[in-house]
Regions:
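C-terminal motif of bacterial Sec signal peptides marking the signal peptidase cleavage site
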Residues: 18-20
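Generic low-complexity segments that are intrinsically disordered, proline-rich and/or Lys/Arg-biased
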Residues: 8, 35-36, 313, 317
Length: 319
């Protein structure tokens, strides 16, 4: 049961991260200000409020950072499958930025997917299958289907597929290797008694599948576990060689390179729309590389888990 639990968690973590470098050109885009050493990079970017009885709210953070000349950068923690209302609110928010830097590993020259387009019937491997499962079973929307990535102010700030593959091959980094690394990290945390993972998650998942309101029950279980994702995924930004992973570290380097380019171009209000697992490392880089200060954190509801209201049974008509 424990091995199946770990397999489920690691597959889920990597899948959510993958939905969605070349060397860091720091010399070309040097930080405008000295490093911010007065603040600690400890922002929490995902939280679940358990309201008991199988209900609760999962929220994603939007953290604001400001430079001395009025520049503003916001880290918008993305939840890749979420309630429709969450994406509708984000779309309104995005319209107000000079530029929105987004994550998406795609081939060079290929446009991002059109909003609302679904590719049912295509296999796409394990990742695509899991995406469809999450969307359909949990009755949620996909980020790539609900957000207009072709908006004029959207700027690609991720590795292209060719670079990602090349760097991964150079380092011998595979999905299996990363899944094993995450599983070992979870095992270590569990052994130290610090794990937040429900030891009975496997049984609860099976039970949830057979509930009349299975979508609500499964959303509740997944939401409880997603908080644990941040600390586990942060481990991918570390490594014995100090280089971190391609999946997280190199993509974040690319994102920061594009961010410096946009600041150099004169953008004053920039949104960075990246998965929550990337945010802890991105915050560190914002402090260290461009010297901005964190000035606030606000929250957006991504999943609202509620039981359906019970409709009172109709009284039989009087004869």
């Amino acid at each position: 049961m424990k091995s199946s639990k770990l397999h489920l968690l690691t597959c889920s973590l990597l899948t959510l991260l993958l939905i969605s470098c070349s060397e860091d050109n720091r010399a070309d885009h040097a930080a405008q200000y000295p490093p911010n050493t007065s603040q600690k990079a400890d922002t929490k970017f995902l939280r679940f409020t358990d309201e008991s009885r199988g209900e609760g709210v999962m929220e994603a953070a939007i953290a604001t950072y400001e430079g001395k000349n009025g520049e503003k950068v916001e880290l918008i923690s993305a939840v890749h499958v979420a309630d429709t209302a969450y994406y509708e609110r984000l779309e309104k928010l995005f319209a107000g930025y000079d530029s929105v830097l987004y994550e998406l590993i795609k081939a060079k020259g290929v446009k991002p997917p059109e909003k609302g387009r679904r590719k049912r019937g295509e296999s796409g491997g394990m990742v695509s299958w899991f995406q469809r499962y999450m969307r359909d079973t949990l009755q949620l929307d996909f980020q790539l289907e609900a957000i207009d990535y072709r908006a004029k102010n959207f700027v690609h700030a991720d590795l292209d597929a060719e670079t990602f593959q090349r760097l991964s091959e150079e380092r011998g980094e595979t999905i299996v290797q990363l899944m094993l690394k995450l599983a070992l990290a979870e095992f270590k945390i569990s052994k130290e008694g610090k794990s937040k993972t429900d030891q009975n998650i496997g049984l609860k998942l099976i039970a949830a599948l057979f509930m009349p309101d299975s979508a609500r029950a499964l959303k509740y279980l997944f939401a409880q576990q997603l908080e644990n994702m941040e600390s586990l995924m942060a481990g991918l930004g570390e490594g014995p060689d100090g280089k971190g992973s391609v999946l997280l570290t190199e993509r974040n380097k690319k994102c920061m390179s594009v961010l410096r380019e946009r600041l150099k171009r004169g953008d004053k209000n920039i949104g960075v729309f990246y998965g929550g697992a990337h945010m802890a490392d991105l915050e560190k880089r914002i402090f260290k590389e461009i010297g901005f200060r964190r000035t606030g954190v606000r929250w957006e509801q991504a999943w609202v888990v509620r039981r359906a209201e019970q409709t009172p049974a109709k009284k039989p008509a009087k004869k």
